[in-house]
Amino acid sequence: MEDQDVLGTINQLAAREEELRAAEGERHLTAEERGELADVELRLDQCWDLLRQRRARREFGQDPDAAEPRAPGTVENYRQ
């Protein structure tokens, strides 16, 4: 997956997160929507982490394609 692909996925996920948050402001989300929001947030964390890995590998002369998405439990606990 190229950086542009990761960024495209990030943009799609961010748009969906925005839709869900807007809906949340207007009404209560269904259980399914709350689950989807949690999934979107997690997938965004994974994508941002993957993009950071790719950029770091490139900066230090390593193959960015060797970067792999980390486990959800790993990226969930990162401090921003």
Where are these regions (language model features)?
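Extended, charge-rich alpha-helical interface modules
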Residues: 1-80
